[in-house]
Amino acid sequence: SLGELFNHVLEIQHFPTELAKVISTIQESQWDLSYRDGGWSIKQIVHHLADSHMNAYVRTKHIITQDQTQIQPYDENAWASSLDADFHHEASYLILLGLHQKWSLLLLESLKDAANQLVKTLEHPESGRQVSLSDLIRLYASHGTHHLEQIKYALIASN
């Protein structure tokens, strides 16, 4: 429903604040903790969130501005292991802060023209699946929450 989507957009809008509440408590020695053996470190998760949500923003722009376009896939594990994954988390957090402000405003504007915007799609070339703007909103609202829970779990498990 439109009400559910509005709530998901609010989740996207407020995600950086929720993330800040958690990462502001992290000690320097905890940034390399992981929620499971072989999983990404907290630092990698924060960088992944910036990478992933930048891609989501671009995908949102493609859906809104183009007809019949494709998602540009990327290897999230390769990105999470790239050189910038060792950089300080602050840069990625600042990206998320600005990005989510702009992204949520774009999504809120899209909801005003819901009948036309929410049904527009992108094609995912690997699966052939059509992904709508509604799908993206739902996916990325839960994506942030999912990784926030991983960070919390890593911190709890380390104590």
Identify what each model region corresponds to.
Residues 27, 41, 75, 88-89, ...:
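Helix N-cap and loop-to-helix transition residues
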Residues 2-4, 11, 24-25, 83-89, ...:
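Small-residue-biased structural context
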Residues 10-22, 80-119, 135, 140:
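Acidic/histidine-rich alpha-helical segments that form the ligand environment
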Residues 32-77, 105, 118-159:
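Short, contiguous alpha-helical
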Residues 1-28, 51, 55-58, 62, ...:
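Alpha-helical bundle segments that constitute or directly flank the non-heme di-iron/ferroxidase center
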Residues 4, 11, 18, 28, ...:
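Glutamate identity and glutamate-enriched acidic tracts
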Residues 22, 26-29, 67, 111-114, ...:
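A short secondary-structure junction motif
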